[in-house]
């Protein structure tokens, strides 16, 4: 059900525990990490069991407010990062500039890999970014998404689930709060944003310039996307990075039109959408090869999906 490269029950018995603690982590933080991992597994397992038995019925909490009268929204995103130090500051700054309140960044780097702390130090001090340690673990994207939602659903009106190469683009250039604070979303429990995919744009090697400047020409084919889900929903189970919530009835597109139960992953793309996600999936050939080698929170290193894309 839940595949982890490191079994939590065996974690304390690792021979290199002292090396790991000595490198960056003291005993208190190490214990805190174990607590996070145990909580992550429990939340995911409980929701998974409910969904498997057909007993899961997501519903808005009794604390629900009248969203048509709400004037200010609190919005956050949950993201997982691995070997993203070249891009993380641009990602964080972008979302800060469009008015996001918080980024929950799950550090999924290798145990002795790079750290986000120095690069994001100012954002961490300002509490715009909170880093959660899940270093060294694999196949944890979906458990993390469920954990992040359950831990924060009562703090935010909307929570997005995005990778670090996904940038929500609002055509009107209005802030993300103004965008969501619109009556078109009053009945929406989830807002699904289509990807607009950007490939290498005929660039081969990495350049020290922003992604938004380097890659400006989207591909002609677009499918898939990511979602923002309304907070305060009880018993919400997230089964994949694209489908946010089993039995959620009111999934909307960027215009507030309800698109569920249609196959919204493939059929919801709008040529005249008012907002979408710029997905810088491959970047340059050099960067994509690096992506294949590193793996991520969902796919292991050298996963066949990566190689198929590279060969095509």
Predicted regions located by residue number:
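Catalytic-site signature of metal-activated, phosphate-bearing donor transferases
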Residues: 2-55, 142-143, 170-312
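Short hydrophobic alpha-helical runs that function as membrane-insertion/retention elements
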Residues: 102-107, 129-131
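Conserved oxyanion/phosphate-binding beta-strand-loop segments in alpha/beta enzyme cores
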Residues: 48-71
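Active-site beta-to-alpha loop of glycosyltransferases that engages the nucleotide-sugar donor
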Residues: 79-93, 109
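Cell-envelope/extracellular polymer assembly enzymes that use nucleotide-activated donors
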Residues: 74-76
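Active-site-proximal specificity loops/subdomain of glycosyltransferases
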Residues: 112-161, 169-170
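Short, acidic, metal-binding catalytic loop of nucleotide-sugar glycosyltransferases
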Residues: 93-102
């Amino acid at each position: 059900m839940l595949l982890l490269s490191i079994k939590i029950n065996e974690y304390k018995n690792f021979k290199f525990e002292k090396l790991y603690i000595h490198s960056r982590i003291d005993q208190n933080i190490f214990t805190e990490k174990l607590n996070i991992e145990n909580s992550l597994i429990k939340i995911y397992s409980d929701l998974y069991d409910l969904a498997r038995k057909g007993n899961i019925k997501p519903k808005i909490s009794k604390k629900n407010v009248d969203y048509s009268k709400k004037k200010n929204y609190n919005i956050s995103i949950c993201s997982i990062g691995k070997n993203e130090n070249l891009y993380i500051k641009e990602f964080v700054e972008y979302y800060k500039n469009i008015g996001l309140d918080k980024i929950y960044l799950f550090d999924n780097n290798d145990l002795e890999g790079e750290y986000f702390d120095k690069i994001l130090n100012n954002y961490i001090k300002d509490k715009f970014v909170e880093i959660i340690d899940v270093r060294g673990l694999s196949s944890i994207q979906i458990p993390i998404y469920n954990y992040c939602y359950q831990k924060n659903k009562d703090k935010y009106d909307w929570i997005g689930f995005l990778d670090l190469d996904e940038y929500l683009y609002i055509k009107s250039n209005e802030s993300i709060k103004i965008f969501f604070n619109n009556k078109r979303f009053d009945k929406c429990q989830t807002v699904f944003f289509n990807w607009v995919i950007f490939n290498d744009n005929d660039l081969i090697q990495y350049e020290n310039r922003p992604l938004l400047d380097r890659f400006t020409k989207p591909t002609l084919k677009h499918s898939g996307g990511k979602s923002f889900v309304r907070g305060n929903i009880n018993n919400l189970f997230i089964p994949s990075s694209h489908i946010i919530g089993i039995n959620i009835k009111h999934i909307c597109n960027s215009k507030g039109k309800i698109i569920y139960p249609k196959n919204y992953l493939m059929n919801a793309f709008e040529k005249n959408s008012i907002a979408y996600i710029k997905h810088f999936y491959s970047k340059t050939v050099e960067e994509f090869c690096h992506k294949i080698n590193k793996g991520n929170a969902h796919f292991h290193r050298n996963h066949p999906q990566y190689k198929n894309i590279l060969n095509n």
